[in-house]
Regions:
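Short loop/turn motifs at secondary-structure junctions and domain boundaries
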Residues: 90-95
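GAF sensory/regulatory domain recognition
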Residues: 23-52
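Sensory-domain boundary capping and coupling elements
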Residues: 103-117
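Regulatory sensory and allosteric helical modules in signal-transduction proteins
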Residues: 44-85
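Regulatory loop-to-helix N-cap segments in sensory/regulatory domains
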Residues: 117-134, 143-144
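Short amphipathic alpha-helical segments
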Residues: 2-15, 129
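A short, aliphatic-rich beta-strand micro-motif
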Residues: 96-104
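Short, hydrophobic-rich beta-strand element in sensory/regulatory alpha-beta domains
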Residues: 10-14, 19-34, 74
């Protein structure tokens, strides 16, 4: 996958949501593999990859990932601290609100895009979820 495609996609997603931290994780061998994210002052790429490397996230052990890989639909959480679906990794990165978009190929979730609001809450709207999902489909249609 070309990083330039993700850079363009993430720019569009940030414009739609006003949220700057956007990351792409592949799902391989039953776990998240961080691939690329936006470089922000809040959470840089190297820190993101290092923390994920030290704290692997397995689909089978993470309720919200099991839900996404089963339903194959975007999910949003407004308040991660008070939502039982929240993953431990959300707290490692200080995520307050999150939208997760599955990248589905041949009826299987191959990757996820996380749009993470860090340091403030963000109410992701139905329109934002639909627009971001369509953008992801359009930009990533020839990937995998």
């Amino acid at each position: 996958m070309e990083v330039t495609i993700l850079e363009e996609l993430f720019q569009k997603i940030s414009e739609v949501t006003t949220v700057g931290d956007v990351g792409y994780h592949r799902i391989e061998e039953g776990r998240l593999k961080p691939f690329y994210k936006t470089q922000t002052d809040i959470l840089g790429i190297e820190k993101w990859k290092t923390v994920h490397g030290q704290n692997p996230v397995y689909v089978k052990d993470t309720f919200i990932l099991r839900e996404i890989t089963t339903k194959k639909q975007p999910i949003e959480i407004y308040d991660t601290k008070n939502d039982t679906r929240s993953a431990d990794a959300f707290f490692l990165f200080g995520i307050d609100s999150i939208m997760i978009i599955p990248v589905v190929r041949e009826d299987e979730v191959k990757a996820i895009i996380c749009i993470a609001s860090i340091g403030k809450y963000h109410q992701f709207t139905k329109e934002e979820m639909e627009t971001c999902s369509k953008l992801a489909d359009d930009y990533l249609k020839n990937q995998y």
